[in-house]
Amino acid sequence: MTMLTEQAGPADDQSLRPVPWRRMAGVTWRQHRITLAAIAAFLGALAVGLWIAGQKTHHAYAAMLAACHPVVSAGCDGLIASFTGMNGFLSNGSALQPVPVLIGAFVGAPVLARELESGTFRFAWTQGFGRWRWTLAKLVPLAIAVAAGTGALGVLLSWYYQPYFASVNQTFGVPGVSPFAPGLFDLRGVASATWALAAFAIGALAGILVRRVLPAIVATLAAYAALAFATGAFLRAHYLTPLLTSTPNISSSSWIISQWWTRNSKFAFNGWPSYSLIQQFCNQPPPAGQSKATGLAQCLSHHGYTLWTTYQPASRFWQFQWIEGSWLLALSALLIATTVWLVRRRAT
């Protein structure tokens, strides 16, 4: 009795080869084109709103400069009030602050969790994709889209706020906007792309850990909120050693870290003087053209008090941006690498 065997031919060898990256990219595009379109539509709508508001802001600022600098002309006060009031659209950037965490929760968290929850990932692995190649093919294109889109939005936000950062504004009494303000710092420069990328990486890792979409979204929101709070409250102020000064005239664009008072070289109190102390020594209004804080500091200095301030000058903005962007990029790479490792080790 003869047993017939079949030799594997070239066609069978071809079926054992890994799927080319180009084909995997095509599959990823078909699976996530709706997500990519949603990202583009969401960021595009924000960009249009910024552009329209920015045009009005820049026109109002140009009119204010023409009427108030270097020679003050009729209508200057009204134009100053008009320009100052226009900042309500994006007061401290709060309107755009949720952008990174929304991307992490609704783009990053479902990208792996949805297939793990439904079980469709097994089909991809049996078609020659492989676990780590399947994971990278899903994460990398979306990560690039997220970073590019939010980076462009950050550039547009910087353009929108450019008139508010001008040093000449203090001449008009226009309230200054610090580039370190929460919500503004996070969404401008390098930080705009790296915060969104970190949120996306957090979401992807949450998806592989909990393996269900809704719990992954909740975990992403919680983890991102904790990271953002810790960064703003404890880390960012100490990227570089704060400067120390006893001069009360600090630019409004600087970031005030802490303030305290001494009297006769001994600590007196923190923060703003008490009402009773002000009434005792400085119950007169400050001289014309002088701010209340500056006038109070000078008045109390005549009674032996000195105001000490630690602060970060606005000139350090880009140094802080590169420091924060660097560690966020490293964190994102670590989270994505951990996600790939977990897919290879844990997913079944």
Kindly label every feature range from the protein language model.
Residues V111-P141, V343:
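Helix-loop-helix units of permease transmembrane domains in multi-pass membrane transporters
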Residues S91-T120, A147:
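Long, hydrophobic alpha-helical segments
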Residues F89-G93, L102-F106, G183-R188, F320, ...:
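Short alpha-helical transmembrane interface motifs in multi-pass membrane proteins
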Residues E6-D13, G44-W51, T84, V140-R211, ...:
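Secretory targeting signals
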Residues S15-Q31, S82-M86, G130, W134, ...:
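Cytosolic juxtamembrane amphipathic/interface segments immediately preceding
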Residues T2-G44:
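Aromatic- and glycine-rich beta-strand/loop motifs that create alpha-glucan
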Residues M3, R17, A53-T84, V168-V177, ...:
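Terminal transmembrane helical anchor/hairpin motif
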